[in-house]
Regions:
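Cationic-aromatic interfacial patches
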Residues: 1-103
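Sec/Tat-exported extracytoplasmic proteins
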Residues: 1-8, 46-57, 122-129, 141-149, ...
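Soluble non-cytosolic domains of exported or imported proteins
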Residues: 33-36, 40, 105-112, 127-136, ...
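PDZ/PDZ-like domain segments forming the peptide/carboxylate-binding groove
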Residues: 40, 44-51, 62-92, 164-214
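Sparse recognition of residues in long alpha-helices and their boundaries
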Residues: 58, 153-154, 218
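Interdomain regulatory linker/hinge segments that flank or connect interaction modules
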Residues: 109-166, 226-228
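PDZ domains, with a preference for the canonical peptide-binding region formed by the helix
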Residues: 207-230
């Protein structure tokens, strides 16, 4: 749920430890309530962080400070408290702002873009269905046993068929979600993306437009099926 360790606190992870040896028992008895409780905690933490990010947009940033924001936090320690997460997210929002500033965008446009992005992420976490949560639970469980095995909910199965059709016959690239980004998994030989030449495996898709002169929609934090629908 939190591969980059930017939402959960160390205390949250400690409280989940009891599930480490009980997960199979819960699934075997068809009792997923404790597992859904983990997701509910995750959703609460995500909303807390997004609300903080939205509030931080109303405050100035000090770009003279010598500090960094690490994108890959998979091996980082969990934040000890809310203050530690606040500092991490202050730098995260500052980095998001700086990226757009370096593109030459004015302050008002930057704040508007980031506000829309964060609000979109909040809407999406609130739209996650029970089917989505159950799929996440089963996939986490099965990946620990057999990494090449996965579970698709009925909705995910239908979306997968749509994605494969649109991605292969449309731009000619297979896409996947990695954290908040849509990433090109591979470019289909002979497809439009390979012929055009600018798209490569591993590229992150941060915006989608329909052609020259059309506005580019910021898709950071979007669900993969919604990105494909554009």
């Amino acid at each position: 749920l939190d591969a980059n360790r930017i939402y959960f606190l160390a205390a949250d992870i400690e409280s989940f430890e009891t599930l480490r040896f009980e997960l199979d028992d819960y699934l075997g008895s068809y009792n997923t309530d404790p597992l859904f409780a983990v997701f509910n905690r995750y959703r609460d933490r995500v909303i807390e962080r997004i609300d903080y990010a939205l509030g931080r947009l109303n405050q100035p940033f000090d770009f003279s400070a010598n500090e960094t924001y690490p994108f890959d936090r998979a091996e980082a320690p969990w934040a000890i408290d809310g203050a530690a997460l606040d500092d991490l997210w202050r730098r995260r929002v500052k980095n998001d702002y700086l990226i757009l500033k370096l593109e030459g965008k004015p302050h008002e446009e930057i704040v508007g873009t980031l506000r829309d992005r964060y609000q979109q992420q909040k809407r999406r976490i609130l739209q996650i269905s029970n089917q989505d949560v159950f799929q996440t639970i089963l996939n986490a469980y099965m990946s620990a046993i057999e990494p090449h095995t996965g579970y698709f909910s009925p909705r995910a199965t239908e979306n997968f068929k749509i994605r494969m059709s649109l991605s292969l016959e449309g731009i000619g690239a297979v896409l996947q979600s990695q954290n908040e980004f849509t990433v090109v998994q591979r470019v289909v030989p002979g497809g439009p993306a390979e012929v055009e030449g600018s798209l490569r495996a591993g590229d992150r898709i941060v915006g989608v437009g329909q052609g020259d002169g059309d506005p580019v929609v910021d898709v950071i934090g979007w669900r993969l099926d919604d990105v494909v629908d554009l």
